[in-house]
């Protein structure tokens, strides 16, 4: 019995030793020095996204507890991960926060690669984010922008400051709620339209805050999460989100509710569930899949588009010559007497498109994209990357790489005048939406939403700062969209 007990105690140490012996033959990426047991956790606050690659190169290995993580910071390495080895690198790590917000990975964004994810992805491509659906929802996008223009016009007449964050989160939230969930946010009974940004902030807490059990799997990590109160804090934050998502679901399942001829996205999924019950399909959609889909649409759709619009106005206020040039193009092309503009007016605006492209370059909404996880051993830039290694693509650093861009920190749309570089996943120096199997499925909707809202903001209004505000002091942060809180328009 004593021999068996000793063997069980020593077994984990033996396995760790054998694993290290195997990996000692590999060429692993360089990285900062690591401490026993905790790895690089003690350096977490000292690792800003742009400075990692300056010392260690474009492929860097970190270790947080027992979790290996590789940071990719060059165009060439990103292409290897997202194109050459896309299949081997296309899964997602399973963390406590993403598990909760995705309803146990029953969504598209955070689900690990497998048959269930492929079925959900097919659903999004074939049923939800089609060109026909996108065109049908055009009227909703135009109506909500009309309301925005009306509201801002009233503020402009009194020279009142605009809370840009609240205004743009409400706009994007209103569009997403009508397209995705079929209800009017301005008349909603279960959420106030001004609470949208607060809900998104709570979701980002769940997505970005790590649990000890993420780094130390097993009983030790779970015990620390419990005794530190981390579990309870997570549950409290998630409770408001879950209540909102459940209200959306109840709204759709309400007896006697009238459904439009072209249903919203959740109606489509509910109808598929009913169809599967009759047909006996092998893949069964559940209520958790519905909530996971709601979570993806609301959180990804609102946060990314709203933060991009905030940065757009922020950069244009800081760069008055660019704002003047793009407004002259818009007002010359469309004329200066239009009472209302439509998405058709987005055509023939060449410089405007360059401005949007430059915003996506300087301020990607998700600076590291969503983390990937390797399904098997791969080689990236000559380095061995073991299976079950997390990979983060530092698109923020790549888009500011001086080897790729002249004066990379400068806001200069003219850099794209004679360039064919685009942001739709084929050019690896510009990847705001990712690339490969995990490219953002709602990319087309997001691009149109940003372009059309920005067109309205620039056609109807001139933008400036409140008195005593200085343009060179309004941007802080490290790739995360904080931008302006208040601006003036007239």
Swiss-Prot record:
The keyword Metal-binding applies. Keywords: Heme, Iron, Membrane, Metal-binding, Monooxygenase, Oxidoreductase, Transmembrane, Transmembrane helix. Its cofactor is heme. Heme binds at residue 440. GO terms for cellular component: extracellular region; membrane; plasmodesma. The chain crosses the membrane at residues 1-21. InterPro entries: Cyt_P450 (IPR001128), Cyt_P450_CS (IPR017972), Cyt_P450_E_grp-I (IPR002401), Cyt_P450_sf (IPR036396), Cytochrome_P450_71 (IPR050193). Belongs to the cytochrome P450 family. This is Cytochrome P450 71B29. It comes from Arabidopsis thaliana.
